């Protein structure tokens, strides 16, 4: 989720299944710093669970703004729910002509056909290859792809969650 800078977070985690070495359920609340696209004090809620009875390996992202909300889940990967306050909900379809060029640029097989892991990895490799080719020319643009910094941020986030949970779900600064 672009431009999201964490100020502090609080995490609670536990195991519901007896004998599990790792926790199987966690909740995280994150307070965000202000930025160009994020209001200071906005919050992000994250629930990670392997005990959600009846659900498959379900991943959902919901972004709630002051005027509209977006929701995507991996059970319906070609659709995004778009809700504007005071208007009917809309379902945006992958590959549709009403989307921006930026949204359609990596749509390889057109709407109506499910994309998969192959295409996702291919998109990442293509972005990385363009960045490497430009770096060889001495051009260092602003390319989007997960890099070492993104990996380090992921590890830092997990460490901060564990720190918070180990302190009785205390708020911990992210910096």
Where do the model's predicted regions map?
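Nucleotide-sugar-dependent glycosyltransferase catalytic core
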Residues: 90
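Short glycine/proline- and acidic residue-enriched helix-loop micro-motifs
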Residues: 106-113
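C-terminal lid/capping helical subdomain adjacent to the catalytic/cofactor pocket in oxidative enzymes
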Residues: 148-153, 164-175
């Amino acid at each position: 989720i672009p431009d999201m800078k964490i100020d502090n977070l609080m995490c609670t985690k536990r195991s519901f299944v007896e004998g599990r070495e790792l926790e199987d359920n966690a909740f995280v609340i994150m307070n965000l710093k202000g930025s160009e696209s994020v209001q200071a004090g906005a919050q992000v809620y994250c629930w990670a669970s392997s005990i959600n009875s009846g659900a498959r390996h379900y991943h959902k992202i919901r972004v709630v703004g002051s005027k509209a909300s977006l929701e995507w889940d991996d059970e319906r990967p070609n659709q995004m729910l778009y809700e504007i306050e005071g208007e009917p909900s809309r379902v945006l379809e992958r590959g549709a002509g009403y989307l921006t060029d930026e949204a359609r640029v990596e749509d390889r097989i057109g709407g109506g056909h499910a994309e998969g892991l192959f295409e996702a990895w291919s998109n990442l490799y293509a972005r990385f290859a363009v960045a490497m080719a430009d770096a060889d020319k001495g051009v260092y643009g602003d390319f989007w792809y997960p890099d070492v910094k993104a990996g380090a941020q992921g590890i830092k986030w997990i460490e901060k969650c564990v720190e918070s949970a180990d302190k009785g779900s205390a708020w911990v600064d992210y910096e």
